[in-house]
């Protein structure tokens, strides 16, 4: 098969998609390259539809091969094993979300999209290549797909918007978002920003949409050049007579049930209406329960949308821009370092903050290199929060994605390491959920930080926006319920301070969004954020002056860089002993800065004194009790503190003449000595005799008397001359 090559230009660099040479047995395959980053994206699908499937059976996988960055995996087996990394999970979601709405209703063939990172240049992130490759592979495959779409990353560097900035440039960008779109408009947005206005964010989003259009052009060229004929999908026909009869039987009851203000009451009322429907239809429809359930769900969705679009109200009675009642509490857990309970309507989230030292930083192996992360946020969504019974397992893709969104929204307001040198872990425990638990996570975790005395730059709140649209009728909803998310057309989450946006995430179920709708949603979200922020600040208006008494205290000691080796000791022996002795955590960096994390002042005092004793250069006149560690003919080397030895010359051992060093001291002896001199090179001269009492005159003369001479010695001969 002939290889086809298609090329566009993004930010002055070639963006290439190739097909026809690799993975030819897949339904579609695209090799995507930008810079020296290359990904292979494949799509495969079952030949028969999945029986009784009432959902889209699509799975998306993203695999980072460590060899792509010229490295060998650091685990015991030296191969890629185990569950996907956090980065892989997030990129799976990023790839899945824009393509999922573009499959037709009634498509039930099991479908799998796999992205494999083959080459990584550490400057161009593979995530946007994965989205483009997935669209390209689906576009040329035989699968029905209402694409193509494309994606770019948008950064703002020194006030200038840039498409697909490099990883190095992103460090200096105050906007970092991924924009996915079709030719007609924006489909998905995900990213963060360093407190920018709604107008600036809107400009960045549509700058990204313009930048991705050339990538859609080359996919159209691919489809024309090598696209396969599409499968014909015939969705199951609706029984319109049955649909009408269901509406006649329970339409009014559904309209009444969905307007129950509380989630459980609404769910219970709809369940009763559905049971009444089965009874009303009778035994003649007993074998069509699955079909009836589907038609009933369609009716509920239709009624809910009608209430919003034609009656101008929401199913729980709120106005379109109204936020549910909010309550906030701080300091709810006495022994944690910071805690807060945030409740908005029937969504309740407990935020807990823990402080640690540099030892507690998360260490991660990525294609960009090994990283340490001093800030972590973990989101937990137990089944009881929605009244369900499920097996409790590790974090799901959804949990990781929601936690990452909250992490991004908060990270921009955290203090830098120079101001607050702690590792921070936030945990979100969702206790109740009826929409927007990720935004509840942001609010509860910010309050937990403030309760724990973390000097954040500004408080952050978050809100989830929804959309119901039908032709010219459009309703933008603030603080959506779970049901509004289900029957609506958009889920748009925005976090920010009073002054601007810190993170956003948008997914839609329709083909695209116009600029006008996005602008309205952003400004309505700002009003909601400010309202929520006001309620939060009523609970705690400013971060506390002091951290929790149960949190570790960080103390800084400076030593000369030459002393680092002595602090650490051979194989880390000395620093381990210091930590065990003082019950502290001690870190030393290359500049000679020693950080001591202690739970009490007494533990800190012990560690500080020990470090200072090792790190300080002895001065003449100081007295130490040391240990003899080496003996030579000319003296004894005495260790006066960890890693520091000095020489006590044989002449400095006693006031009288010493024939052999071992006549006075032996290996391991404890000896009190005085520092006589410290040379510029750091060599230390010690004296033992300086601390001994001066001998009596006669005793000194006796011990110092000359040794007896042999008869006939030289002295006599000299005298006889």
Swiss-Prot record:
Positions with a binding annotation for Mg(2+): 485, 491
PROSITE patterns on file: KH_TYPE_1, S1
Alphabetical keyword list: Cytoplasm, Magnesium, Metal-binding, Nucleotidyltransferase, RNA-binding, Transferase
Similarity annotation: Belongs to the polyribonucleotide nucleotidyltransferase family.
Pfam families, A to Z: KH_1 (PF00013), PNPase (PF03726), RNase_PH (PF01138), RNase_PH_C (PF03725), S1 (PF00575)
Name of the featured protein: Polyribonucleotide nucleotidyltransferase
Chief location: cytoplasm
Stretches assigned to the KH domain: 552-611
Record-linked CDD domains: KH-I_PNPase, RNase_PH_PNPase_1, RNase_PH_PNPase_2, S1_PNPase
InterPro entries referenced in this protein's UniProt entry, alphabetically: ExoRNase_PH_dom1, ExoRNase_PH_dom2, ExoRNase_PH_dom2_sf, KH_dom, KH_dom_type_1, KH_dom_type_1_sf, NA-bd_OB-fold, PNPase
Molecular function per GO: 3'-5'-RNA exonuclease activity; magnesium ion binding; polyribonucleotide nucleotidyltransferase activity; RNA binding
């Amino acid at each position: 098969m002939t290889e086809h090559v298609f090329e566009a230009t993004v930010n002055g660099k070639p963006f290439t998609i190739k097909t026809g040479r690799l993975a030819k047995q897949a339904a579609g395959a695209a090799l995507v390259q930008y810079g020296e980053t290359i990904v292979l994206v494949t799509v495969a699908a079952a030949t028969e539809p999945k029986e009784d499937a009432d959902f889209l059976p699509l799975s998306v996988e993203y695999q980072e091969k460590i060899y792509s960055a010229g490295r060998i995996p650091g685990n015991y087996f030296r191969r890629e094993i185990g569950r996907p990394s956090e980065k892989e999970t997030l990129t799976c979601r990023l790839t899945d979300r824009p393509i999922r709405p573009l499959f037709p209703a009634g498509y039930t063939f099991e479908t799998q999209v796999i992205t494999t990172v083959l080459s990584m240049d550490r400057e161009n992130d593979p995530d946007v290549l994965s989205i483009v490759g997935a669209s390209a592979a689906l576009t040329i495959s035989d699968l029905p797909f209402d694409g193509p779409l494309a994606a770019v990353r948008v950064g703002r560097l020194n006030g200038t918007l840039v498409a697909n900035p490099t990883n190095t440039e992103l460090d200096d960008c105050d906007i970092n978002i991924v924009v996915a779109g079709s030719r007609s408009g924006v489909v998905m947005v995900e990213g963060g920003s360093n407190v920018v206005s709604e107008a600036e964010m809107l400009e960045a989003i549509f700058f990204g949409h313009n930048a991705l259009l050339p990538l859609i052009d080359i996919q159209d060229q691919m489809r024309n050049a090598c696209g396969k004929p599409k499968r014909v999908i015939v969705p199951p026909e609706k029984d319109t007579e049955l649909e009408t009869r269901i509406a006649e039987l329970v339409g009014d009851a559904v309209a009444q049930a969905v307007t129950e203000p509380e989630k459980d009451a609404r769910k219970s009322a709809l369940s009763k209406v559905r049971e009444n429907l089965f009874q009303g239809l009778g035994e003649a429809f007993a074998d069509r329960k699955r079909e009836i359930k589907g038609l009933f769900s369609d009716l509920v969705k239709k009624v809910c949308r009608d209430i919003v679009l034609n009656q101008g109200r929401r199913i729980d009675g709120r106005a379109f821009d109204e936020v549910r009642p909010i309550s906030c509490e701080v300091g709810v857990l006495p022994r944690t370092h910071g805690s807060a309970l945030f409740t908005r309507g029937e969504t309740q989230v407990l935020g807990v903050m823990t402080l640690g030292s540099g030892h507690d930083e998360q260490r991660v192996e990525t294609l960009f290199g090994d990283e340490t992360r001093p800030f972590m946020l973990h989101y937990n969504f137990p089944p009881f929060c929605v009244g369900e019974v499920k097996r409790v397992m590790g974090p799901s893709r959804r949990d990781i994605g929601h936690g990452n969104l909250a992490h991004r929204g908060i990270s921009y307001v955290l203090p830098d390491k120079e101001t607050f040198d702690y590792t921070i872990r936030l945990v979100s425990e969702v206790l109740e959920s009826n929409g927007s638990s990720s935004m509840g996570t942001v609010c509860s975790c910010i309050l937990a930080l403030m309760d724990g005395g973390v000097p954040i730059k500004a408080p952050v709140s978050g809100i989830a926006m929804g959309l119901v649209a039908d032709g010219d009728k459009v309703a933008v909803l603030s603080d959506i319920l779970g049901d509004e998310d289900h029957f609506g057309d958009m889920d748009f989450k925005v976090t920010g301070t009073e002054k601007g946006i810190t993170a956003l995430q948008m997914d839609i179920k329709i083909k695209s969004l116009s600029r006008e709708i996005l602008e309205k949603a952003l400004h309505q979200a700002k009003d909601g954020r400010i309202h929520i922020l006001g309620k939060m600040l009523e609970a705690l208006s400013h971060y506390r002056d002091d951290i929790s008494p149960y949190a570790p205290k960080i103390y800084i000691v400076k030593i000369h860089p030459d002393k680092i080796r002595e602090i650490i000791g051979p194989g880390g022996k000395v620093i381990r002993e210091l930590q065990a002795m003082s019950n502290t955590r001690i870190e030393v960096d290359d500049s000679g800065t020693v950080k001591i994390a202690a739970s009490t002042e007494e533990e800190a005092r012990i560690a500080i004194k020990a470090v200072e004793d090792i790190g300080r250069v002895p001065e003449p006149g100081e007295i130490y009790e040391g240990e003899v560690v080496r003996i030579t003919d000319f003296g004894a080397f005495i260790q006066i503190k960890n890693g520091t030895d000095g020489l006590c010359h044989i002449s400095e051992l006693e006031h009288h003449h010493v024939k052999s060093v071992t006549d006075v001291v032996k290996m391991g002896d404890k000896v009190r000595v005085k520092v006589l001199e410290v040379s510029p090179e750091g060599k230390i001269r010690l004296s033992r005799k300086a601390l001994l009492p001066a001998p009596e005159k006669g005793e000194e003369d006796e011990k110092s008397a000359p040794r007896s001479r042999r008869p006939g010695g030289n002295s006599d001969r000299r005298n006889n001359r």
